[in-house]
């Protein structure tokens, strides 16, 4: 019992000097004026009922809805979504990932949410996943 107590005390002493690594944010590590926000949106290409969203339909969405809101540019990736459904079956869906680098401002937020809403409505989608993170950008 005394050995066990001694070992625990030694472990506490050793661990007392340990600290969790600090989480550096983009503000901490970015050079002046190059901090931005990066938002990646994930768009499924399967309709709940009917044909898959075509390449032409996707490109029309990008050209007419995305680009006018993000004139400085964007990047599109082909992606494949996968998840385990409530029925225990693996579901897979071809997808598109849209990466936007933008300021952290109200207009960008409005534009991003508009894109999500337009896509869900136009293509009968349940959701458009959104992932945000601070980034350092240089051109």
Over which residues does each language-model region extend?
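C-terminal motif of bacterial Sec signal peptides marking the signal peptidase cleavage site
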Residues: 14-17
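Bacterial N-terminal signal peptides that target proteins for export
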Residues: 1-7
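Terminal, regulation- and interaction-focused segments at domain boundaries
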Residues: 36-55
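A general secondary-structure signal for short beta-strands and their flanking turns/coil
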Residues: 34-38, 93-95
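Mature extracytoplasmic domains of secretory-pathway proteins
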Residues: 57-95, 101-106
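Helix-rich interaction surfaces within compact, conserved domain-sized segments
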Residues: 90-139
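Glycine-rich, aromatic-bearing surface loops/beta-hairpins
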Residues: 24-36
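Bacterial signal peptide processing site
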Residues: 19-21
